[in-house]
């Protein structure tokens, strides 16, 4: 049985950064396991200048990511709470410069740096089973070519994302605040270049988001609740396009564009947190620890933050350090939730629509408590 100091489950930014931190700063022999094959489309998002501090901590020069990985973001235009456009850097008032992230380039660079420094990555790991015996973790999985494998380690990191299947196996259940999903697509327009700009527009059933990823490519996503999506059939391309055409500002920006794939993606976008006590020598990072509404633009930034801080707590073998990490996560989520609530409270035009009733009712409940 192959043995490692630490195993990280999940190959996104949180997992790759955790693996890099364990290897670079704690001299651990690290294995990273990923369920997928890294071919799925990864949606870019806005990041603040602080991401470069975490890259410096991981000893990763910005030059290694390529010229197009961090594109300057020239602001955000919103139609939120009013039919009049407003222009600002971020609805969450991010300080300093912001950038549009090329997720494919970013994720690949993190993983390549991990491998080049001696880390091991195994993709396409299915049917995972986890157990702990005498403070040693055993991870079983099935690989399509190598068959059934068993590996063991001292430390286990859950970076498996919002679904946090690994944590669920261990009885660490997240608490979901809502059922938000994103239904979207990449789009191209051969006759018109996209601006490096973000647009957000609220509507009766949720809100729309658009960002120019390059002059040739943009992303458009509709955010609503799962049951509303099903009732409106927003996951059907023809219906999605119909409602997109009914938006105000975004419809004009995408006129003449075509989706790059006939099928839309549907991705979970709900807010969630974890209150369970963690098993010994185990920690959750990124979306597996806390998940944020995309309106916050906190996903990647938090992935890097939690990765760097969690690994220090994990390898300290101190329950107090892990407890402090969990308390820090609770504080971050509480602060995020207050700000997210304020954002949704700004939109008062559709008080009788289910999506907004839920946000305003939850806000009232929070104030009452």
Curated annotation (Swiss-Prot):
Cofactors demanded by this protein: FAD
Superkingdom assignment: Bacteria
Note accompanying the cofactor annotation: Binds 1 FAD per subunit.
GO MF annotation: an example: FAD binding
Enzyme Commission designation: 1.-.-.-
Cellular location(s): Cytoplasm
Protein name: Putative FAD-dependent oxidoreductase LodB
Protein species of origin: Marinomonas mediterranea (strain ATCC 700492 / JCM 21426 / NBRC 103028 / MMB-1)
């Amino acid at each position: 049985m192959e043995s490692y100091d630490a195993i990280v489950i999940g190959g996104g930014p949180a997992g790759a950064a955790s693996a890099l931190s364990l290897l670079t700063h704690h001299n651990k022999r690290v294995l990273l396991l990923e369920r997928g094959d890294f071919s799925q489309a990864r949606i870019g998002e806005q990041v603040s200048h602080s991401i470069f501090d975490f890259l410096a901590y991981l000893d990763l020069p910005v030059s290694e990511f390529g010229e197009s990985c961090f594109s300057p973001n020239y602001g955000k235009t919103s139609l939120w709470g009013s039919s009049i456009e407003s222009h600002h850097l971020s609805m969450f008032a991010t300080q300093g410069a912001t950038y549009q992230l090329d997720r494919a380039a970013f994720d690949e660079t993190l993983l390549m740096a991990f491998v080049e420094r001696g880390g091991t990555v195994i993709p396409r790991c299915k049917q995972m089973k986890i157990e702990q015996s005498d403070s040693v973790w055993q991870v079983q999985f099935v690989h399509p070519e190598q068959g059934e494998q068993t590996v063991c380690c001292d430390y286990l990191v859950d970076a498996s994302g919002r679904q946090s299947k690994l944590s669920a196996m261990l009885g660490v259940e997240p608490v979901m605040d809502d059922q938000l999903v994103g239904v979207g697509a990449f789009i191209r327009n051969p006759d018109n270049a996209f601006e490096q700009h973000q647009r957000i527009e609220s509507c009766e059933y949720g809100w729309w988001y658009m960002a120019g990823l390059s002059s040739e490519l943009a992303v458009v996503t509709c955010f609503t609740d799962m049951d509303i999506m099903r009732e409106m059939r927003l996951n059907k391309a023809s219906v999605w396009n119909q409602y997109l055409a009914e938006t105000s500002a975004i419809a004009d920006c995408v006129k003449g564009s075509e989706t790059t794939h006939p099928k839309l993606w549907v991705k979970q976008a709900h807010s969630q947190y974890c209150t369970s006590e963690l098993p010994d020598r185990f920690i959750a990072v990124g979306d597996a620890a806390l998940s944020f509404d995309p309106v916050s633009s906190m996903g990647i930034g938090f992935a890097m933050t939690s990765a760097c801080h969690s690994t220090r707590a994990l390898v300290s073998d101190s329950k107090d350090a892990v407890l402090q990490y969990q308390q820090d996560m609770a504080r971050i989520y509480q602060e995020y939730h207050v700000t997210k609530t304020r954002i949704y409270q700004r939109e008062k035009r559709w008080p009788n629509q289910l999506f907004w009733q839920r946000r305003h009712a939850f806000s009232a409940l929070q104030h009452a408590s």
